[in-house]
């Protein structure tokens, strides 16, 4: 079984779902055996949809907490499209399930199937899930053993379909398309000063001249050093002012993060060359050195990113085409009974078992797509 499948199984089995003290106070009774999505070959139950929704709920609330955000009332908050966050999340779950159904439906076109070994792993995972969760949790989720087995089967097809669906994607990327240059630069900011009351005040001309003089001092020291191509620019910057520093970065033709004037200056240089004047950018003065016109490591990484982007676009295009032709009905009446609220909260408990380092790492990484 590959790493992705292990992660999916870890999420559903090793991560035991538990109810909070308030669970059950805010949801209508749902019948998990009712059909939620009915397609050409498969029917996904409300219980399965509810399980996927709770997995998403746990992940989102955990992420919000990790980022220091509050979760109280988050599901009732409005999004840009006018729906609540809860409604948007439910819509997303439906799209996830529809996609998995279609991937399974088209699996034979790519000679993809679930092996006996994978079926055995799924059966074992389902058994562990049912044993690990309390009767109260299972009833609240309104899932049956067959629901979890179907979900893990759909996950398996989803995982196995990506490679054959993207096999014909052009993986050739020329250096000219992916080229990344490596530079080192010192930035002396001329942005407005922030006052104690939170307001801002622009720098005076004299203050800006002082900033430019600092940048000039850094440049002069760098050019006067024994080997400007290899000199530590950060050390020189701090010799001028302890608050100054230098940064190493890479950029490509499509870069929009770095200052335009800084990039223009860097592009005129060869390996190891220092731009011989202070660059006046937007709200800053810069000293810049081009370390490598073509950073091989960064360029190869960019090539990989471009190929992955091509594959993802091809994969999504196929899925979208299938969705347009698909006849999948949604049981809106029953799905409406499934809600997200502060009064219906789930937790994800990690198993109290010893694991190998690789397995332990995967348990913490497992995420629901």
Where are the predicted features?
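Peptidyl-prolyl cis-trans isomerase
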Residues: 217-262
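Extended intrinsically disordered, low-complexity coil regions enriched in Ser, Thr, Gly, Ala
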Residues: 114-120, 228, 238, 301, ...
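Bacterial N-terminal signal peptides that target proteins for export
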Residues: 2-12
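Second-shell loop/turn segments in exported
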Residues: 34-39, 79-94, 103-113, 143-148, ...
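PPIase-associated folding chaperone regions across multiple families
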Residues: 27-32, 39, 136-213, 257-369
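Solvent-exposed loop/turn and edge beta-strand elements of beta-rich ligand-binding domains
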Residues: 1-2, 15-18, 43-57, 121-122, ...
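C-terminal motif of bacterial Sec signal peptides marking the signal peptidase cleavage site
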Residues: 20-24
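N-terminal targeting/tethering segments
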Residues: 28-143
